[in-house]
Structures are given as C-alpha cells and as structure tokens.
Amino acid sequence: MTLSRYTIPILLLIILLAFGLRTYNLDKHGIFFDEKASVLVSQGMAMEGNTQKNCFYTKGKVAFTPKEFWADKSLEDYFDAIRRSDIGNSPFYYIILHNWINIFGIKDYSIRFLSVIFSCLTILLLFFFIKEHFKNVKLALLACFLMAIEPFFIAYSQQARNYSLSFFLTLLATHIFLKIVKNEENNLKKNGFYWVYGILSAMCLLSHFLSATVFLAHGLFVLLFVRKTRLWILLPFSLSIGGLAFGYWILFGGGNYTFPSLSHQAKVYYQEAHAIPNVHAGYIDPATFPNVAKKSLPIFTDLFITSNNILSNTVGKKNLILAILISILSVFSLYKYQKTRQNLWIGVVLGINGLGFLLYSTAKFQYLELVNCCLLFCFFMEYWKETTDKRQRKINWFLVILAFLPTLFLVVMTFKNGHTFGLSQRYSGFSFPYSIIIVSLALLQTNVKAKPINYIIWGVFLIQLFFVSMTIKTVLNDESFKYNYRDKARVENPYPLIANELQKMYQTGDTIVYPSYVKTFYEADIYTKNIKKSVLDAQYVNLYFPKDAEYIQTIDEREQNKVILKKRNGQKIEIFDLKGDLFRY
C-alpha cells in the first residue's frame, strides 16, 4: 500500500503534538507514591527498607549513611523489593527502568520520560497496525491523532509506571497475532512470528499481570473465528513461552507471594467496603449491582473519546429522557434521509436538536454530544454492514472484543471479590487503541454515507474535542481527580530539594534526622500492616544523595513531619516540614 507525500509529514506532526502534550509540565508536579515505589524497586530497595537491613533494621544500630543505603543489592533483594512494593508485578518494566536510571539518573523528568517514549511509540505502532489490517491511511492518521490527544494516554505517559510500556507491548502482540492469523489463512508457514508472539506474551505478562486479558481476547477470537489446525497447534506452544516465564516468576521469582498478597488485600478491601460506617464510601464500596454500574459505566463511556466525561456532565432525569427521545428521532430521521435523500429530514435533525438545546437545563453541549454518539454508533454499524470481506468482518468483531473484554473482566472480578476497589480505568487501558479505531471508523463513515449531515456530526464532535481539551488542561495542571487521582495540584518533588539543601549545609559531625510517618493504608499491605516505624522519608531523600556520601543519618520515631539537621554543637535546623500528607503524594 503506497503512501501519499503528505502522509509521513502529517504523522510526524501528530507525533510531535503527542510529544509536546506528554512532556508539558512533565516534572512540575512531584512523583506520587506508586512512582516512588517504581524508583525504589528498580534499585532493589523495598519500600520500608527490608532489603536494606544494614541501614534500618540492624539491632543496636541507629545511624546509617548514603554509602550504606546504596550498598550493592543481590538478585534476591530485587525480587524482594518487587514482591513487597508491587505485589510481584511488572518485573520487565523494572529491568528497563533500572537500566534507564543507570544512564539518565534519578530525576522526575527522566524517569517519566521513559513512559513518554513508549506512549509516542504506541501512536506510531497504531499507524502501522491500521495500515496493515485496515488498508486505510486516512483511518490510521485520524486514529493516531485521537490517540495523541486522548487524556488517558497523556495522563499515564506522565507517570513513572508500567502502563505505557504495557499498552505498547499488548498492541504489538495483537499486531503480530493478526499477522499470524493472516499467514495461516493464506497458507504461509512463517514460524518466526510464533516465536515473536511467544516472547511478547512473556514481556506483556511480566509488564502487567492484567495484560492477560488481551491474550484472553486473542484466544476468544481463535475460538470463534479461526479454523486452521496448524494455528490451533502452534499458538498454544507459542503462548507457553509467556506461560513458562510467568510461572517461573510466580513460583521461584519475586512473584511467589503475589497471590497471597492479593488474597490479603481482597479481604481487607472487602471488610472496609462492608464496614458500618464505611469511611471509604464512594471509593471502596460493596459490589452491589447499583454500585458496580455506577462505577463501571463511566469506565465504558470514557473508553471512547466521543463520550469522554459525558456521564459526569449529563445530569437530571428530564434532560436524559429528552436526550434519549431526541437520539431516537435523530436516528430515525437519518435513516429516512439516507433512504429518500429528502432535505426535509436534515431539517428535522437540525430542528429537534436545536429545540433540545434550548430545553436542556444544563450541560447543553454534552447532551448534543450524547445524541452524536448515538448517530456515530449507527454509522459504525453501517460500516460493519457494508464490510463484505470475511476477514475484515472478523477483525470488526475482534475490535469489539478487545474494546470491551478487559473492562468486562474487571466487572466480573469486582463481583467475585465483593468490593469495587479494583474497578479502575487504568486496569483496562489495553482497550483504548481499539476503541479509538471504532470511533475513527464511525467518523469516516459519515463522510461516505451522510453528506451533508456529516458536517453537523463533525461539528458537534469538534465541540466535544473542545471539552476534551479542557480535560487535558486539568490533567497537565495535575487537577484531574479521574486521571491524576487528585484535584489539587502537587508542587515540585520536595525530596530532591531536601537532599540538595542538606548537601549544602552538612558538615562533619552533623546528624540528619528524618521523621517517621506511619500511614493507615498500610493495612492493605501484608508486609507492612503492623509497621511501627516508617523509613520512607529517609529512603526518598537518600535517592538523591551521592552514592559514596557518608552523612550520618537517623530516624526519630517520635517526629512525624520535620527533616532536621542537628549540628555538632547541638543546634537543630529545620530543613523541611512535610506536613502530614500535604507533601507526601
């Protein structure tokens, strides 16, 4: 398939846009708890110091130095750090991050930049994925643009976590999977793809355990649509590479306490969800049908950029009923227009939506977009109906499976566990590339079958993109509770600032004194649920000290917030007050 001379420049502009959005304010807001875990684990350091007993848990020893903190770690130390700080998840990501830090150091910008790279690579991969499997460059460019501005991808590309890597690897694995299916259908025996697919399955599972839902979708597709004996034989052998790697990790590596840890967490969250009173109501709730529906419906709608945030803004039963009625009438009018080509029906669409716009008591543009979503759904179904190629129809089904199965899996597990804690968009983010393709197909179908109504649909979609841009703004300003987990922006990471100030002021004979701040959420962590002394603040500061420094340091269990430099003459200088949770993100 040949590309026009404009394709590559447009693609590069999209990548540049994505890069700009993902690097904007990249280190303005300090790394939060999970990101701190990423850094510590990548260095073989368990949160709360179990792999650093020489510093924190040697009987009779009350002081330590950065040199001791940075002492060489064994392979078992790395395993223990992962099992204690991330329930054994993501070893492949930590290997990459470890080597990345060896080259670029520990700075908020550099550790997050790794995720930016994988996020931008995912956009580039999506282009080739669509070009290969849909033979449509316009579709590929539109989908890449939508991925570039998708708030979910922007938010998680700015985290030093495994998500961007996992999204890239699962899309690549899906790409290779479809190439295998295509080769088998064309009787091409290319065994190398099976090896690549198997290795990718291992990388995916060891990047995030829930990437298994993507391979579950692959298996369901084979079960429903593939009737090639050779593939049925070789694909399980290929996946056994990932299975063996995962099995080894769970049995003999840092994942050997994963399932006990998950079981412990499930019990704790269940108890909290069913407690009376429930102090975590709205965050951890019993898995009743109303609670699960309330929490899962926004996850499903936010998968599609056309309905992003729509449930947060469309409130009121009267408005919703009116929007549903207008949607039905709009779909009917569209059907009549396509049958008769009478401009009267265009007028009906414009008239009823204009009337609705006047009658909606709130969120007028969002209700217009709700109607638009219904029309776009019809156009996607029309695209499906007009797809005559059997292989392409199978891929249409595959898109739907991949778009919904990961979230459906979360819903099932939510009912199984009895609480809603794990029902989160980030755990089903593998679906986004495919939901983006679905939206792009529907939008392009309007240009084929709905002129001049397509201009109206695109116009309303552009209004939706304006609201998406507002969401992006809150993400980049660190004020999106949905994507940043907070609505009040963090300041710059205080721990490097503390380390820099201490390096300037420390003199031989001085002692650095750290606070001990014990968090109640540790109850969900099987390793630290009974902790009496926290060494986290000391760990975070020492990450930014020279590895050979010999500053004398200790921890004051009675002090919760203040980092103190105690001079050799007894003078105490307050370096920083962490103020409870205010600066401990």
Feature roles, as predicted:
Residues G459-L462:
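Glycine-aromatic-enriched surface loops/turns that form tight recognition elements
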Residues I8-L11:
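N-terminal signal-anchor/signal peptide hydrophobic helix marking the start
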Residues I14-L125, F129-H133, K138-A140, F145-I149, ...:
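Membrane-proximal helix-loop-helix interfaces that form the catalytic/acceptor-binding platform
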Residues M1-R5:
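Short, Lys/Arg-rich, polar N-terminal cytosolic tail immediately upstream
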